[in-house]
A protein has these predicted regions:
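Conserved class I S-adenosyl-L-methionine
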Residues: 1-43
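Class I SAM-dependent methyltransferase SAM/SAH-binding core
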Residues: 40, 48-93
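A short acidic, Gly/Pro-enriched loop at the edge of an enzyme's catalytic core
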Residues: 95-102
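Residues lining the SAM
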Residues: 106-108
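A short glycine-rich, Lys/Arg-flanked "PGG" loop and its adjoining helix->strand segment in the class I
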Residues: 120-132
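SAM-dependent methyltransferase
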Residues: 137-210
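C-terminal lobe and adjacent flexible extensions of AdoMet/dcAdoMet transferase-like proteins
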Residues: 204-244
Length: 244
């Protein structure tokens, strides 16, 4: 899963300021006086957040469903001499060796879980391995973003090494099918690869129901990269939740 995406992911995400986002997330842990010492990075992808938290002195467990994503993550950790445990697991079947005192899930990774039962299970599994009174911070794309921003629109991302055509098809039920065509330059030839997946936005009621069943209390909901309340045109929200 996400095999082709893994090797182009970082190029396509060049506009993401990972350090700024890491500092923002860490500040939320500190705001609630819950700075982690051993943290779960769920759906860690290529390890950008995992390594940046490790550079802050946090011990990190990175979990992702893609072997290829984790391969890239391990290379980064080796280069930075970070000792991070990476596990290839489905979020809905998360199984750690013990508990953690903090958890994150970033960049709409939970939206990739399109089955509501699996969505609830993923949150419940995080809660199971989270110590009492500690925080799980995650973000989600909103219904507005899926219906009005992604919708049936097509985007083009053009870098020196990769040309990507990003096509969206709105499926209803707040779900968008995303089809990516990559054209990667090798020598003087462009190689074409593709990746397809769906993302689903969940209603506030669905999210709160999943949190309640998992024994997590919502401490705050912010517009991403801020401490402002979300509005009707907010594209991504951040949930700060605490295990009861």
């Amino acid at each position: 899963m996400y095999s082709e995406f893994a090797y182009s992911y970082d190029i396509l995400m060049q506009n993401v300021d990972y350090q700024k986002r890491t500092d923002y997330l860490y500040s939320l842990f500190e705001k609630f006086d819950r700075a982690p010492t051993l943290m779960l990075d769920l759906a860690c992808g290529t390890g950008e957040f995992s390594n940046r938290f490790a550079n802050k002195g946090v011990s990190v467990i990175g979990v992702d469903i893609s072997y290829d994503m984790l391969s890239v993550a391990r290379e980064k950790s080796a280069e930075q001499q970070n000792d991070i445990l990476y596990l290839c697991q489905d979020a809905a079947e998360l199984d750690l060796y013990g508990t953690v005192d903090g958890a994150i899930c970033c960049l709409d990774s939970l939206n990739h879980i399109t089955d509501y039962g699996d969505f609830c299970n993923a949150i419940a599994r995080v809660s199971l391995f989270l110590e009492k009174d500690r925080l799980f911070i995650f973000d989600l794309n909103t219904e507005y973003k899926h219906s009005c921003v992604l919708g049936n629109n097509t985007f083009v991302i053009d870098t020196n090494d990769v040309y990507c055509v990003w096509q969206n098809e709105y499926q209803g039920n707040n779900t968008v099918e995303i089809n990516l065509d990559f054209f990667t330059r090798e020598d003087n030839v462009y190689l074409r690869t593709g990746e397809s997946f769906c993302e689903r936005a969940y209603t506030s009621a669905e999210i709160e129901n999943a949190l309640n069943k998992a024994g997590l209390k919502t401490e705050a909901i912010y517009e991403e990269m801020s401490q402002n309340e979300p509005c009707d045109t907010t594209q991504r929200v951040v949930y700060v939740t605490r295990k009861m």
